[in-house]
Every structure is written in structure tokens, then in C-alpha cells.
Regions:
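Compact integral membrane and secretory-pathway proteins
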Residues: 1-144
């Protein structure tokens, strides 16, 4: 019977982050109120994020890349390299989440529930990526 590898949970965390990008990450009540999601969609009167490719779009691209790397690690396709890449990408996503907060959250802009969902997903992705990396490297050591 096959066992469930930790890398599949990294895939789940990346999917949660990907979906959370469309949830409200920023909210405001100033000027009539408004919300913005991580990918730049705005509703109401909110000035941030500015138009163009930004941190939120980069997070979506990297979370898609994390899905691929973690799935490769879970399936055993270059598991050591893929699990190391998954850890690197998940740490980078955590840094980008912090950077998003530093760039856009200041009074009267507050974080929305999507930011919390995405932040928790990235934190879990880092922890689970470490477990996936340990599992991949220890499994490769047993085969030799």
C-alpha cells in the first residue's frame, strides 16, 4: 500500500495559497470603502495595489511552480532536487507574503481574511517542505 507523502500536503498548501489570491487581501473603510485581492483586482475606492505586474501576481506564479515541484517530489521524480526546490519556493513565498504586507498595509488600509489564509498556507508549506525534503533525502539514502 502506498503511503501519503508530505509533499502532497505541500501541493495542498500551494493550492490554498493560489485560491486565496482571489480573496480580499486588503480592505479599507476610507473614501467609501473598498477591497483588493492579491492579484490586483479592486472593488470600491482603494488605491493599492498599483496596476501592473506586482508581488501578488508573482506569488500566484510561484505557487503554481510550487505545485509542480512538490508533486514531482511526491511522485519520486528527481525527488531530492524537487523537494529542495519546493522548500526554496515556499520560503520565497513566505518572504513575498511579508513583503506584500510591508508594501501595502498602512492606515487606513488593513489586511483582509485572504491575507491570513495565504499567510497560514505559506507557513504550513515551509514546514511541510522541510518534512518532504527530509523524506526524499532519507529515502534516497536507503536505496543506495
Amino acid at each position: 500500500m502506498a503511503r501519503l507523502r508530505p509533499a502532497w500536503f505541500v501541493v495542498l498548501c500551494a493550492l490554498v495559497l493560489l485560491v486565496s489570491a482571489w480573496l480580499p487581501w486588503l480592505t479599507t473603510s476610507a473614501g467609501g470603502g473598498g477591497r483588493a485581492n492579491a492579484i490586483g483586482g479592486k472593488l470600491g475606492q482603494i488605491a493599492v495595489p498599483p496596476p501592473g505586474f506586482g508581488v501578488g501576481q508573482l506569488m500566484v506564479v510561484l505557487s503554481s511552480t510550487l505545485i509542480v515541484a512538490a508533486a514531482m517530489a511526491a511522485r519520486g521524480l528527481s525527488a531530492r532536487i524537487a523537494s529542495t526546490a519546493a522548500l526554496s519556493i515556499s520560503v520565497l513565498l513566505t518572504v513575498l507574503t511579508w513583503w506584500y504586507f510591508r508594501l501595502y498595509v498602512a492606515p487606513p488600509i488593513a489586511v483582509g481574511y485572504g491575507f491570513y489564509v495565504g499567510g497560514v498556507a505559506t507557513a504550513f508549506a515551509v514546514v511541510l517542505s522541510v518534512l518532504a525534503m527530509v523524506a526524499a533525502w532519507s529515502e534516497a539514502g536507503r536505496r543506495r
